[in-house]
């Protein structure tokens, strides 16, 4: 795959109407060469789905050379990858259970020099069995638990069902955020549905397949 700069330019143009929104380039399965090309063109915010793959591509030497890189984990976090994730990512967007929150808290106590500083709670907004995330009813309890362990919860994220009326799920996530804390960031919207997500208040859109074609 190669970077589709025409699509990238179009997305950036669309974002001009939403000054509080940012693009997170989803670079899973992409080469370090393509990532470096984007970095050299001024892009710094990337999302990866797998901890080991991200660690292999966004090496210590790369991070030292380009210290403005902001790397987000947007895939599930397994307990046995907690330490590596905390030393690889600036933000983890996929807190989906108390157990992983507890594991993160334990690692932080062992190592004060971890990289990760911000966290999002993933909400299973469509209550789909095959998807990770806390249910909407569990969100407040999990949020309070994370805060009690002094994790900095920056926002909430979702991956909605693949349905025509995706707007209703974005509206629901926004309402959940407003009831929890209006200052929290909304991470919602991907290649197929980022336009309605932006209109409904998304602060972070996660785009991969529209950029790498």
What label would you give each PLM region?
Residues 203-204:
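Divalent-metal-activated hydrolytic enzyme cores
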Residues 198, 209-213:
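Expand to "…catalyze enediolate/carbanion chemistry for C-C bond making/breaking, isomerization
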């Amino acid at each position: 795959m190669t970077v589709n700069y025409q699509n990238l330019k179009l997305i950036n143009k669309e974002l001009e109407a939403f000054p509080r929104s940012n693009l997170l380039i989803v670079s899973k399965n992409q080469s370090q060469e393509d990532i470096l090309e984007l970095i050299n063109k001024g892009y710094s915010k990337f999302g990866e789905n797998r901890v080991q793959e991200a660690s292999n591509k966004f090496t210590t030497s790369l991070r030292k050379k380009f210290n403005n890189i902001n790397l987000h984990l947007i895939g599930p976090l397994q307990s046995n990858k907690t330490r590596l994730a905390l030393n690889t990512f600036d933000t983890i967007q996929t807190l989906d259970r108390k157990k992983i929150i507890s594991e993160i808290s334990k690692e932080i106590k062992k190592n004060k020099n971890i990289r990760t500083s911000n966290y999002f709670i993933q909400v299973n907004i469509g209550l789909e069995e095959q998807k990770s995330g806390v249910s909407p009813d569990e969100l407040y309890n999990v949020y309070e638990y994370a805060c009690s362990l002094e994790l900095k919860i920056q926002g909430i994220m979702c991956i909605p069902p693949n349905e025509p009326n995706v707007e209703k799920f974005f509206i629901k996530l926004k309402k959940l955020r407003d009831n929890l804390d209006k200052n929290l960031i909304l991470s919602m919207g991907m290649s197929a549905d980022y336009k309605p997500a932006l209109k409904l208040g998304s602060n972070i859109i996660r785009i991969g397949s529209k950029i790498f074609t």
